[in-house]
């Protein structure tokens, strides 16, 4: 079953998809700024957020500013990075190594076994962060520090599922915290992190 790494990208119109692609590439390359199609600030903010839901490995930028020039069809987006570029590369390498090391332990399991491996890893190694410590909303909190809020845990599950080629999205809700949704053998599984169980949806 294919991973759902572009789930939110696929929900966008063509112009928004162009902006998504440029922003994602700019963030992956750690560019100081890049030109994106001119969209409303809300659209750009939404796209920036959705990239981080599709690609939780982009944990090092959560905000941006932009400049618009008269008579231009583009805006210059300026990402705000949480760390220096050198530190981002170090953290990124550490997270990639951690994810690959964990995935190797489960790669020979069937899909349900992989899902249970991820579940057990999260339950045994990640504490819910009531104090909302630094980076607890990102994979670096869950996989690096062992503490995270629902969003950080859902992102950790997503990045592990992507590595193991399990379909998974981070479900968004205004009323409830983010949750990871996995599709295993024609059923959908919701990760309920407070109850520490997987439920069939």
Language-model features: locations:
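Linear, non-domain "peripheral" regions
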Residues: 1-98
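Hydrophobic/aromatic-rich core segments of domains that either
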Residues: 152-201
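Generic recognition of cysteine residues
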Residues: 19-22, 55, 150, 161, ...
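Secondary-structure boundary elements
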Residues: 83-142
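Generic structural signal for hydrophobic residues
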Residues: 47, 118, 156-157
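Solvent-exposed loop/turn segments at secondary-structure junctions
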Residues: 82-83, 125-129, 148-150, 174-178
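A short, highly charged nucleic-acid-interacting micro-segment common to nuclease
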Residues: 139-153
């Amino acid at each position: 079953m294919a991973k759902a790494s572009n789930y939110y990208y696929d929900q966008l119109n063509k112009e928004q998809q162009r902006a998504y692609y440029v922003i994602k590439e700019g963030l992956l390359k750690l560019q100081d700024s890049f030109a994106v199609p001119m969209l409303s600030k809300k659209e750009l903010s939404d796209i920036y957020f959705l990239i981080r839901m599709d690609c939780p490995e982009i944990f090092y930028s959560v905000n941006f500013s932009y400049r618009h020039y008269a008579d231009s069809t583009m805006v210059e987006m300026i990402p705000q990075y949480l760390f220096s570029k050198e530190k981002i590369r170090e953290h990124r390498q550490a997270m990639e190594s951690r994810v690959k090391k964990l995935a190797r332990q489960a790669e020979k399991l069937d899909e349900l076994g992989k899902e249970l491996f991820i579940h057990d890893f999260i339950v045994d190694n990640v504490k819910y962060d009531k104090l909302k410590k630094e980076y607890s909303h990102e994979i670096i909190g869950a996989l690096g520090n062992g503490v995270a809020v629902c969003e950080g845990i859902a992102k950790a599950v997503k990045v592990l599922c992507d590595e193991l080629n399990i379909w998974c999205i981070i479900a968004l809700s205004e009323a409830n915290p983010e949750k990871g949704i996995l599709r295993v053998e024609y059923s959908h599984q919701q990760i309920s992190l407070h109850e520490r169980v997987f439920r069939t949806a």
